[in-house]
UniProtKB/Swiss-Prot annotation:
GO terms for biological process: diaminopimelate biosynthetic process; L-arginine biosynthetic process; lysine biosynthetic process via diaminopimelate. Belongs to the peptidase M20A family. DapE subfamily. Its cofactor is Zn(2+); Co(2+). This is Succinyl-diaminopimelate desuccinylase. The keyword Transcription regulation does not apply. Pathway: Amino-acid biosynthesis; L-lysine biosynthesis via DAP pathway; LL-2,6-diaminopimelate from (S)-tetrahydrodipicolinate (succinylase route): step 3/3. Homodimer. Keywords: Amino-acid biosynthesis, Cobalt, Diaminopimelate biosynthesis, Hydrolase, Lysine biosynthesis, Metal-binding, Zinc. Zn(2+) 2 binds at D103, E138, H355. It comes from Rickettsia canadensis (strain McKiel). It catalyses: N-succinyl-(2S,6S)-2,6-diaminopimelate + H2O = (2S,6S)-2,6-diaminopimelate + succinate. Its EC number is 3.5.1.18.
Length: 384
């Protein structure tokens, strides 16, 4: 059934923050199979409204929860897609194409099927199965999983272990389980100089001269050597804007944007202080004014592999005959919110095709993912 569910889900053009009825589809499906469900819409204005779903079957412990998102990134130029239809599932040559198939509607379809099969085959299982889904993971992530977790805990629901269906695997299904994530902090630096003619530099103050010095030092910072589970922290410059299209004018100001992805040896505040010291030193030397802003998108986190995490890894190995590695690589995810409530793993399809034109997954990979999810639920809820 996971293929049918996946094809249906691809058909919903659920570009962040729109659910576009994808969550309502899942809500109806789970209700028909005896789940208690609740849809909540959070957001300060209509343009920011986010649709969220919590659904649970059973009332015992442990409560194993699948956490995911139905929203997808924009499809780009439709003409570059097979059949020019990114929101219509296209099955060919043992693959399924469509926006969101990898990130992460394929994982949702597999866990839906695994959960419903377990309920059908083991009606007296011990514990609970639940789903927490949002339409705002690819965007600001402000009114999605974070708020929904707080809401369900206020309603006295408790999750004992979560599986987040992000595409984690690298070259084959089963090779990677995420148990943490790097942090991310974005910087915006504005430097104010003095506009002038390039022939009279002594009558101007070029803010680019200062910025070049600053960025040169920043990109050469060796933040750390990495840790057991984390790669080294790194800074990337993402944009420089002077608003100057002429070659004979020294610009009045310049803006630069850069991002740091950091491990658990740092936090956003200490990194902000470090960057501020460097910027302040050069701006004083060049006698220019500056404004530095930074916004933390996420702090880093790491979990010690506890028994449930190890159990999940054992299920992956016994099911797929491959020993998974624990990793923290990649971008941020909603796991950063879930970890405040329970232990978790992130495990899904191959990450290579996520967000790309002609995003696809092999049908055989869907079967492998389903097998892992089903066997894990069996292990946790039936001991068979």
């Amino acid at each position: 059934m996971y293929i049918n569910y996946l094809k249906d889900l691809i058909g919903f053009k659920s570009v962040t923050p729109e659910s576009n009825l994808a969550i309502e589809y899942i809500d109806d499906l789970l209700k028909k199979h005896g789940f208690k469900t609740e849809i909540k819409i959070f957001g300060d204005s209509k343009s920011e409204q986010v649709t969220n779903l919590y659904a649970v079957y059973g009332n015992g412990k442990p409560n194993i929860c699948f956490v995911g998102h139905v929203d997808v990134v924009p499809a780009g130029d439709y003409h570059l897609w097979h059949n020019s239809a990114p929101f219509k599932a296209n099955e060919q040559d043992g693959k399924i194409y469509g926006r969101g198939v990898v990130d992460m509607k394929g994982a949702i379809a597999c866990f839906l099927t695994a959960a419903l099969d377990l309920i059908k085959n083991n009606p007296d299982f011990k514990g609970s199965i639940s789903f927490l889904l949002t339409s705002d993971e690819e965007g600001k992530a402000k009114h999605g999983t974070k708020e929904m977790l707080q809401y369900i805990y206020d309603q006295e629901y408790k999750i004992d272990f979560a599986v987040v269906g992000e595409p984690t695997c690298e070259t084959e299904i089963g090779d990677t389980i995420k148990i943490g994530r790097r942090g991310s902090v974005n910087f915006k630096l504005n430097i104010e100089g003095l506009v002038g003619h390039v022939a009279y530099p002594h009558k101007a103050n070029n803010p680019l001269s200062c910025l070049i010095k600053i960025l040169n030092e920043l990109i050469n910072i060796k933040f750390d050597e990495g840790t057991e589970f984390f790669q080294s922290s790194n800074l990337e410059v993402t944009n420089i804007d002077v608003g100057n299209n002429t070659s004979n004018v020294i610009p009045a100001s310049v803006e630069a944007y850069f991002n740091i992805r950091f491990n658990n040896l740092h936090n956003a505040e200490t990194l902000g202080q470090l960057i501020e010291q460097i910027v302040k030193r050069y701006c004083k030397e060049y006698k220019v004014d500056y404004k530095l802003e930074y916004i933390s998108a996420a702090e880093s986190f790491i979990q010690n592999p506890n028994d449930k995490i190890k159990d999940f890894a054992d299920i992956v190995e016994s099911t797929l005959k491959i020993k998974p590695k624990f990793s923290t690589s990649g971008g941020t995810s909603d796991a950063r919110f879930v970890k405040n409530y329970c232990s978790l793993v992130e495990f899904g399809l191959l990450s290579e095709m996520a967000h790309k034109i002609n995003e696809y997954t092999k049908i055989s990979d869907l079967q492998k993912l389903y097998d892992v999810y089903y066997n894990f639920l069996m292990e946790m809820l039936t001991n068979k």
